């Protein structure tokens, strides 16, 4: 994963994400710690991914020639797996219910998918509720779209910290309604910009200028600008210097 929590395909790092290409959902993290093979399953997730997780547990137990594994500091036996799948299913449904109960205090919640973060709000929770199959299908559909998920780069310019997105012509692009850095890893960003055709516009100005968006999630919209639309935007909004 990169600094924006996006998947870097076909690379193995200290922490690597495993997934079934049929299910673009949350993924299963694998890493080595003190000679132990460690797997991490983020909840809530779908039953497909819960089943895949425990399939991998069985595979690695067989590889290590053992019937035992540790989960949440408890020693488990492979015969406990069916019960653990029921537990994780219930925990996932409860987590979705908990998110819905807390929406009055938050605009949305951000969860981490395999390919990139997804913002879950009222619309999303109304669609899938606590149904894990619907939740899993939602995660897959969002990440299977043939679209560019824009992420920011942060720069220091004249003593100020600025954030910058890139937007190209005729590319379906997913942009945040409110620009941000995932997990607030970098704070104190004074201004946000979009880089187009070797020119800069202020982020908020471009978002006001664009006439048509398609909904993506609670904090993202999809846009596809033609060369002519980008030229029109730059003629009106381009700035000479930061």
Label every PLM stretch briefly.
Residues 108-242:
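C-terminal interaction module
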Residues 19-21, 32-34, 41-43, 70-71, ...:
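Surface-exposed beta-strand edges and flanking loops
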Residues 45, 49-74:
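Acidic, low-complexity cytosolic segments
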Residues 2, 62, 104-105, 140, ...:
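Generic surface-pattern signal
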Residues 3-48:
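Short, intrinsically disordered low-complexity segments
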Residues 73-136:
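Mixed-charge (acidic/basic) macromolecular-recognition segments
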Residues 25-27, 75, 200:
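Short, solvent-exposed loop/turn motifs
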Residues 28-32, 78-83, 195:
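Short amphipathic beta-strand/extended segments with alternating polar/hydrophobic composition
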